[in-house]
């Protein structure tokens, strides 16, 4: 229960990272988004950056190569963000850069997923 909420929180924070990813190998699912971003939840709620967080962010960035994948990831992240309380969106906005991933927009739960390309 708490793990599910934590996973959803991380997904919301990394919404924009996945949305703008340039490379992919397979279709994105909400389960994939949740599992890859689960290690980031503690950090987004004020704790230390977990060891697997950046690896998950990079993997999702690489997997979201197509517009449909990026839109799916975006919607998964927004759903997760709405389900988890206590996310520090300032930390979320800085997380991609900390992990060496560049995204051309701000991370926000209000991102219009239909406008993602």
UniProtKB/Swiss-Prot annotation:
One Pfam family, short name: Tryp_alpha_amyl
Gene Ontology BP annotations: lipid transport
Keywords, ordered alphabetically: Disulfide bond, Lipid-binding, Signal, Transport
Signal peptide: 1-26
InterPro entries per record: Bifun_inhib/LTP/seed_sf, Bifunc_inhib/LTP/seed_store, Plant_nsLTP
Cysteine disulfide partners in this protein: 30-76, 40-53, 54-99, 74-113
Family annotation (PROSITE patterns): PLANT_LTP (PS00597)
Gene Ontology molecular function: any one: lipid binding
Family: Belongs to the plant LTP family.
Role description: Plant non-specific lipid-transfer proteins transfer phospholipids as well as galactolipids across membranes. May play a role in wax or cutin deposition in the cell walls of expanding epidermal cells and certain secretory tissues.
The protein, known as: Non-specific lipid-transfer protein
Source lineage: Eukaryota, Viridiplantae, Streptophyta, Embryophyta, Tracheophyta
